[in-house]
Regions:
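An alpha-helical appendage that flanks or caps ligand/catalytic pockets
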Residues: 9, 36, 136-173, 211-305, ...
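Conserved, mostly hydrophobic/aromatic
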Residues: 35, 39, 47, 75, ...
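Short, acidic/polar
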Residues: 22-35, 99-102, 186-196, 288-298
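Active-site mouth loops of central-metabolism enzymes
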Residues: 11-26, 88-97, 177-189, 243-246, ...
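Flexible, glycine-rich active-site loops centered on histidine and acidic residues
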Residues: 2-23, 91-160, 208-215, 219, ...
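Alpha-helix-loop-beta-strand connector modules within alpha/beta enzyme cores
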Residues: 57-84, 142-149, 153, 227, ...
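N-terminal beta1-alpha1-beta2 module of alpha/beta enzyme domains
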Residues: 1-78, 180-182
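Hydrophobic faces of well-ordered beta-strands that scaffold small-molecule active sites
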Residues: 5-9, 43-45, 83-86, 114-118, ...
Length: 336
C-alpha cells in the first residue's frame, strides 16, 4: 500500500502547537492550496472549544480556535483532490446526531473526501468546562457509544440508540455520506484506543510514537479486529508526528527544542503521552530531508500507511509554509 501524507493546517493550534497570535482565517486556505499543489494527500485539523489552563498561564491573550468541520467545508469548496480529516473531533463535546448530520453534509459537499478521526480529547478540563454537571462521565465509554451511533446514523433509515451516555430515539438522519463507509478513525495512544480502533474503526490515529511502538500497537489493533471478526489488515495505521526539517540535524533539533510544539508535547505527558517517557526526537521526524526520508521508511516498515496531520515546527505561518514546501519538494518525491 502506498504511503499517504497529510498536513495539519491551522484550526485549533494557537497557544498549544504555535504561539499567540499565529494564524488568521485568511491563512487557512493558502496553506491547504499549497499542500494540494505540492502533492500531499490530505489536510487535517484538531478540535477545541475553550482555552487550556496551561495556555492561559503562558499567554495574556486567548487563542483563536477555528471549528474544524466548518473550516473543512470552506477548504473542500476550494480544493479538488485533498481529503479533509479531523485529528481529532472530540466526541464527548458533541451531540452524536448533530455530529452525524455535520459529517454527512460535509462528505456530500466535498464529494466523499472526509475522514473523521474521533476521540476523548486530551484535556478533561475542557469537557468539564462545557459540562460541569457531568464531571464523573467516562469519556472513553462515551466515545465507544458515539462511534457505534455514528455508524448506524450513517447507514440506517431510522435509528434509536439507548446507551449509557448517547441516547436518542427514532432519528432519521439524511442525506447519508457519499462514502460507504465514511472512514472513522480512533484517536489516541492508550490500549483502550487500540481496542476501539480494532473493534470499531477504519484507522488508528496515535500521536508521537516510535516505529517500534507503532509496530506493537498495530499488532494490538489487528488482534482486537480479529476478536470482533473484522479484517485488521484493512485498518489504516495513521500516526500524527511533529516535523522539524532543516538543512542539518543540529539545526532541525535546535528548532524543535525551542518550539511551542515541544512545550505542547510536554503538556501532553500527563494525558495522551503519559505512557511515553521522553525521547521525543525518536518519536517524530526531525532532521535533514535525507534523515527524515530514512526515518519515514522505518515507520513504513513498522506498518504505517498514513502520516496523518504532520505538525511542522514554526513560529509564523510563513515559516510553517516554507517547511511544508521544503518537505514537499525534497521528501515527498522519495515516496511517489
Amino acid at each position: 500500500m502506498p504511503l499517504s501524507f497529510g498536513v495539519h493546517i491551522p484550526t485549533c493550534i494557537e497557544g498549544m502547537m504555535y504561539p499567540i497570535p499565529f494564524a488568521r482565517t485568511e491563512d487557512i486556505l493558502p496553506t491547504a492550496l499549497l499542500c494540494e499543489r505540492l502533492g500531499f494527500d490530505s489536510v487535517w485539523g484538531n478540535d477545541h472549544m475553550t482555552t487550556q489552563r496551561y495556555v492561559q498561564r503562558e499567554f495574556a491573550d486567548p487563542p483563536n480556535y477555528y471549528e474544524p468541520l466548518v473550516t473543512f467545508a470552506y477548504v473542500a469548496a476550494r480544493t479538488t483532490r485533498l481529503r479533509v480529516c479531523t485529528c481529532i473531533l472530540v466526541l464527548p463535546m458533541r451531540h452524536m446526531v448533530v455530529a452525524a448530520k455535520q459529517a454527512a453534509t460535509l462528505d456530500q459537499l466535498s464529494g466523499g473526501r472526509l475522514t473523521l478521526g474521533v476521540g476523548t480529547g486530551a484535556y478533561r478540563e475542557e469537557y468539564e468546562a462545557l459540562f460541569p454537571d457531568a464531571k464523573g462521565a467516562h469519556r472513553g465509554t462515551l466515545v465507544d457509544e458515539g462511534m457505534r451511533a455514528l455508524r448506524r446514523l450513517f447507514t440506517e433509515r431510522r435509528v434509536t440508540f439507548l446507551g449509557r451516555y448517547v441516547r436518542f430515539e427514532e432519528v432519521e438522519c439524511f442525506p447519508k455520506p457519499v462514502q460507504d463507509p465514511l472512514p472513522l478513525y480512533a484517536g489516541g495512544n492508550h490500549a483502550e484506543v487500540r481496542r476501539r480502533a480494532g473493534e470499531l474503526g477504519d484507522g488508528w490515529l496515535p500521536a508521537v510514537l516510535s516505529p517500534e511502538e507503532i509496530r506493537r500497537g498495530a499488532e494490538d489493533v489487528r488482534r482486537a479486529a480479529e476478536r470482533a471478526a473484522r479484517d485488521g489488515a484493512r485498518i489504516d495505521i495513521a500516526p500524527q508526528l511533529v516535523v522539524s526539517i532543516g538543512r542539518t540535524q543540529d539545526e532541525a533539533l535546535r528548532r524543535f527544542r525551542g518550539s511551542q510544539l515541544f512545550k505542547h508535547l510536554e503538556s501532553l505527558s500527563r494525558t495522551t503521552l503519559r505512557e511515553q517517557t521522553g525521547g521525543y526526537e525518536q518519536r517524530n521526524l526531525i532532521g535533514s530531508p535525507e534523515a527524515i526520508s530514512e526515518r519515514i521508511r522505518a515507520y513504513q516498515a513498522a506498518g504505517v500507511t498514513t502520516l496523518a496531520g504532520m505538525l511542522f515546527v514554526a513560529s509564523t505561518v510563513t515559516e510553517m509554509q516554507d517547511a511544508i514546501e521544503l518537505f514537499g519538494r525534497e521528501v515527498l518525491p522519495n515516496f511517489r
